[in-house]
Amino acid sequence: MNPIISAASVIAAGFAVGLASIGPGIGQGTAAGRAVEGIARQPEAEGKIRGTLLLSLAFMEALTIYGLVVALALLFANPFI
């Protein structure tokens, strides 16, 4: 096993998780803030806003999970070794 490839795989796995969580993290914070503003403006639409928010948060979180899967593939099932 080449130590340079192993080291690069560990660094790439770290970048994969880190970069894959930045965008969804910002998006989730923005979406939650806007949902709270929407509920404050229209309390009668709370159920619809909450349902839409939870669905969109699940889609955003899936992006982070994809980054984690790529990182795990690089660490444990590395195609470059």
From Swiss-Prot:
Gene3D superfamilies in the record: F1F0 ATP synthase subunit C
Keyword GTP-binding belongs to the record: no
InterPro entries: ATP_synth_csu_bac/chlpt (IPR005953), ATP_synth_F0_csu (IPR000454), ATP_synth_F0_csu_DDCD_BS (IPR020537), ATP_synth_F0_csu_sf (IPR038662), ATPase_proteolipid_c-like_dom (IPR002379), F/V-ATP_Csub_sf (IPR035921)
Protein name per UniProt: ATP synthase subunit C, plastid
Domain of life: Eukaryota
Protein species of origin: Cuscuta gronovii
Keyword Plastid attached: yes
Lineage: Eukaryota, Viridiplantae, Streptophyta, Embryophyta, Tracheophyta
Site (Reversibly protonated during proton transport): 61
Main location class: plastid
The family this protein is said to belong to: Belongs to the ATPase C chain family.
Places the protein is found: Plastid membrane
Keywords on record: ATP synthesis, CF(0), Hydrogen ion transport, Ion transport, Lipid-binding, Membrane, Plastid, Transmembrane, Transmembrane helix, Transport
SUPFAM superfamilies: F1F0 ATP synthase subunit C
TM spans (from-to): 3-23, 57-77
Coiled coil: none
